[in-house]
Amino acid sequence: MNIEKVIAREVLDSRGNPTVEAEVHLDSGFVGRAIVPSGASTGTHEALELRDGGSRYMGKGVQQAVRNVEEALGPAIVGLDASEQIAIDAALMAVDGTPNKGKMGGNAILAVSLATSRAAAEELGVPLYRYLGGSNAKTLPVPMMNLINGGAHADNSVDFQEFMVMPIGAPTFREALRYGTETFHSLKKVLSSRGYNTNVGDEGGFAPDLKSNEEALQVLLEAIEKAGYEPGKDIAIALDPAVTELYKDGHYDLESEGRTLSTAEMVDFWADWADRYPIVSIEDGLAEDDWDGWQALTTKIGDRVQLVGDDLFVTNPERLQRGIDTGVGNAILVKVNQIGSLTESMDAIELAKRHHYGTIISHRSGESEDSFIADLAVATNAGQIKTGSASRSDRIAKYNQLLRIEHALGDRAVYLGRKALR
């Protein structure tokens, strides 16, 4: 199962921006391929995404990252056994030699890392989720379906980035997807009836110019009920306000509402919403380095609401360990391109599970047809996945792959519903 050659190319993501695709060819003739995603709202502690700059593709080209794969990263792993993922990733990171993968680019390293695992699974003739997770990989994730987009993901007046539904009362993943999809179609009718546009944002959710952030919750609840479901029982609400994007000079600027909140006021804001609405999960409710604020929020509502660190933890075991040690948050969002290798992503998931933190496998706003994260969610029995709305083929690709996996597992498939929540 030795690696014979590694090639890369520049392809486009769902926003029409260049990204890296890598192919790992084995001496047996099997090939693994992977396309890396890209985020719009990125944490400052993420692995570096290498872009070319200049005028080509408005500076977003990745030709240098592609060259790094073919001229440096690929040659470093040629001849190695593709099934030795830890050794492969260590070799890739040794070529880079920087803490944030700033020399080769996290996008270059990750493309090769993921493609290697796919190549190994192909040669062994096993599904990717089984290769990564073994015989106990059987838990289908509860989808966090992003139905209303705001913030950096949409050109509208909504400050907060994602308003999601979670079908926690569904018996299976297949039914959960139906619950969420029916709510998506119901929401379109609700928005139209209120005179709002039904254009969609980067992740396939609607991006209406609502009168306030709270109106997003109100239209979601109406859509859930009109779809025939009970809010809080069949379908709950999850939020990703991504407030690092709103944090300026030590305060949180809710521009659309003309309000500026202190950390203490932001904590009270979320506690109030959690009291009045069926909100079961809040991601990045405070800024990525507002550790004191995070601690206060966790103390206040962490016993009843899943508090997810995305920009806070950036899929980094070291930052997660700090959160564990200081009682900050109770769940981690896992984005493979934040840390830049499969091994480090798996390490973060293992650390979270060891300390009873929830795990949510996530896409990025710039995605592709690559469905790797669907297999990763099942492989790690993560229990939850964020991969957008019920529209745009780059999002649907992940849902369809999960449907295939559930079908293949048959009676062995597990859907945890509410039990998946931290």
Swiss-Prot record:
Superkingdom of origin: Bacteria
Alphabetical UniProt keywords: Cytoplasm, Glycolysis, Lyase, Magnesium, Metal-binding, Secreted
Transmembrane segments: none
Active site location: 203 (proton donor), 335 (proton acceptor)
Keyword Magnesium carried by entry: yes
UniProt cross-references to Pfam families, sorted A to Z: Enolase_C (PF00113), Enolase_N (PF03952)
Main location, first listed in the record: cytoplasm
GO biological process per UniProt: glycolytic process
Class in the EC hierarchy, top level: lyase
UniProt binding sites for (2R)-2-phosphoglycerate: 161, 335, 364-365, 386
Record flagged with keyword Secreted: yes
Matching SUPFAM superfamilies: Enolase C-terminal domain-like, Enolase N-terminal domain-like
Compartments it resides in: Cytoplasm; Secreted; Cell surface
Record SMART domains: Enolase_C, Enolase_N
InterPro entries, alphabetized: Enolase (IPR000941), Enolase-like_C_sf (IPR036849), Enolase-like_N (IPR029017), Enolase_C (IPR020810), Enolase_CS (IPR020809), Enolase_N (IPR020811)
Chain positions recorded as Mg(2+) binding sites: 240, 283, 310
Family statement: Belongs to the enolase family.
PANTHER family: ENOLASE
Database matches in HAMAP family: Enolase (MF_00318)
Protein name as it appears in the record: Enolase
Gene behind this protein: eno
